[in-house]
């Protein structure tokens, strides 16, 4: 008998109490999984966000599957509320131990770092897609679909610059799932989102007549050239402030604290709101969602803005622009 999606294992399911049915396969609520699929996608935050499109694609190809996704604790929020994901697991020793004793029909690992590739090799599955760990310690493609991306990543000045596929197209190829313009998705609780917006507008005396520009001025430490210059932002801010209706929100991590403070002080305007380090990742999503236009480099802010369908102005340094699909938003 196939395992029903309502099966608890240690206690009766809800329909046992509702219908009193003991023989599961005779119940009208019996709804078994046909495939068990595991996605490993741990890093980085922005990549986890833009990988969410894959969940929808998998469910289109495998509509009766159980989809489990393991990710870093700080990225879990990006997956919560996604109707295509059945189970979310945080990356820790307990979760790894639990997954080691299970078996999946399909395992998809999108990361090339050792912690992810070693998990892919340690977990049991009938079919492996994406990346595993070679016995000599380097990542290796586990299926034909991953070979193109693997080769591309080893040739930055050749194949990577010539590549015309977006990130979503690449991970769908790795996963052996047809890509049909599926978009990244983040779920925000409607009531929480409204409360955040109302409180923010009240605190800073913003009305719906204002136009809000969110400027995410920094980037992660691995590729520092993803961020625009401070002088460039100062010129932009001064230009935007010429319209009295415009409100500017500065965002960033601790790395941008000094930079944003200097941008703010260069104008001495009360229409600049410096929110650097003020909010959690969840609140940061709420902040992006209340903005009219998001201006950012290739960072997690860009991918959140895409997922929330915000208008975007973006710029690219080391990232090949063709890998980023803005889905008509900028």
Task: Give residue ranges: language-model regions.
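Catalytic machinery of carbohydrate-active enzymes
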Residues: 1-330
């Amino acid at each position: 008998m196939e395992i029903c999606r309502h099966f608890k294992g240690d206690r009766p399911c809800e329909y046992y109490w509702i219908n009193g049915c003991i023989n599961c396969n005779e119940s009208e609520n019996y709804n078994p999984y046909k495939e068990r699929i595991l996605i490993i996608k741990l890093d980085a935050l922005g990549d986890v966000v833009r990988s969410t499109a894959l969940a929808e694609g998998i469910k289109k190809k495998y509509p009766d599957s159980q989809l489990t996704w393991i990710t870093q604790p700080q990225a879990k929020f990006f997956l919560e509320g996604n109707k295509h994901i059945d189970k979310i697991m945080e990356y820790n020793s307990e979760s790894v131990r639990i997954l080691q004793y299970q078996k999946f029909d399909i395992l998809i690992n999108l990361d090339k770092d050792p912690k992810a590739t070693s998990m892919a090799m340690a977990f049991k599955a009938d079919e492996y897609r994406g990346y595993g760990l070679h016995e000599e310690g380097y990542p290796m493609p586990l299926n034909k679909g991953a070979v193109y991306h693997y080769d591309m990543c080893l040739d930055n000045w050749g194949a990577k610059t010539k590549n015309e596929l977006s990130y979503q197209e690449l991970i769908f190829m790795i996963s052996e799932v047809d890509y049909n313009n599926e978009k990244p998705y983040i779920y925000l609780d409607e009531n929480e989102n409204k409360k955040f917006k109302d409180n923010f507008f009240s605190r800073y005396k913003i009305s719906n007549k204002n136009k809000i520009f969110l400027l995410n001025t920094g980037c992660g430490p691995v590729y520092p050239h993803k961020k625009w210059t401070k002088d460039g932002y100062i010129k932009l801010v001064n230009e935007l402030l010429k319209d009295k209706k415009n409100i500017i929100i500065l965002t960033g991590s601790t790395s941008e604290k000094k930079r944003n403070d200097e941008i703010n002080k260069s104008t001495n305007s009360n229409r600049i709101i410096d929110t650097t380090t003020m909010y959690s990742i969840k609140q940061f999503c709420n902040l992006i969602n209340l903005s009219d236009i998001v201006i950012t480099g290739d960072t997690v802010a860009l991918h959140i803005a895409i997922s929330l369908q915000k208008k975007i102005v973006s710029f690219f340094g080391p990232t090949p622009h063709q890998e980023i699909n803005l889905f008509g938003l900028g």
